[in-house]
C-alpha cells in the first residue's frame, strides 16, 4: 500500500499557494481601503510607489477595453491552468522541491487574481515601478509577483543538469 507522500505527490506545497493567496488578498484589501484610484504614495523617489489601479484585462491590461466577456475568458483560463498545476504538483517526485515551489507560487498567484476577477470583475493592482516621471511599468500586485517568480523558477528548471535522464531539482 503506498504511503500518503507517494499517493499525494507534492500537494503538501499547497500551503505555499494558500499563503500567496492570503498575502495577495490582504494586501489588495489594504491598498484598496487606503488609496483612491491612481493616487500614488512614493516609497522610493523616482523608482517605486504604491498606487491603486483596476485591471479588467490580463497582463499589461491586454484586452482591458473589452465589453466584459474577457473577465470570464481569463477566469476560465485561470481555472484550467490551476487544475493543471494541481495535477502536476500531485505527480511530482520527492526530489522535485524546486519545481514544487515554482508550481505552488504560480498557483497561488493565479488563484489570487482569479478571485478578484470573479468577485470584483477586475484585478486590483497596487505596485508601481517607474523611473522618474518618464517611464512607468504597468502596475501589478503580489499575485503577479508570485506568478513571475514561479515562472522564472520553471524556466531555470529547464536548464538544470540532468543525471540518468532525470532533471535534478533540489
Curated annotation (Swiss-Prot):
List the active site: 125, 144
UniProt main location, coarse? membrane
Q: What would be the name of the gene that encodes this protein?
A: lspA
Q: What is this protein called?
A: Lipoprotein signal peptidase
Q: Which GO terms describe its biological process?
A: proteolysis
The GO terms this record gives for MF are: aspartic-type endopeptidase activity
Task: Report the EC code(s) recorded for this entry.
Answer: 3.4.23.36
Cell inner membrane in keyword set: yes
Function noted in UniProt: This protein specifically catalyzes the removal of signal peptides from prolipoproteins.
Q: Which reaction does it catalyse?
A: Release of signal peptides from bacterial membrane prolipoproteins. Hydrolyzes -Xaa-Yaa-Zaa-|-(S,diacylglyceryl)Cys-, in which Xaa is hydrophobic (preferably Leu), and Yaa (Ala or Ser) and Zaa (Gly or Ala) have small, neutral side chains
GO CC term (a single one): plasma membrane
The source organism is: Pseudomonas fluorescens (strain ATCC BAA-477 / NRRL B-23932 / Pf-5)
Q: Which UniProt keywords apply?
A: Aspartyl protease, Cell inner membrane, Cell membrane, Hydrolase, Membrane, Protease, Transmembrane, Transmembrane helix
- Membrane-traversing stretches: 11-31, 41-61, 69-89, 95-115, 136-156
Q: Which InterPro entries match?
A: Peptidase_A8 (IPR001872)
Which pathway does it operate in?
Answer: Protein modification; lipoprotein biosynthesis (signal peptide cleavage)
What is the annotated localization of this protein? Answer: Cell inner membrane
Q: Does the keyword Transmembrane helix apply?
A: yes
Its family?
Belongs to the peptidase A8 family.
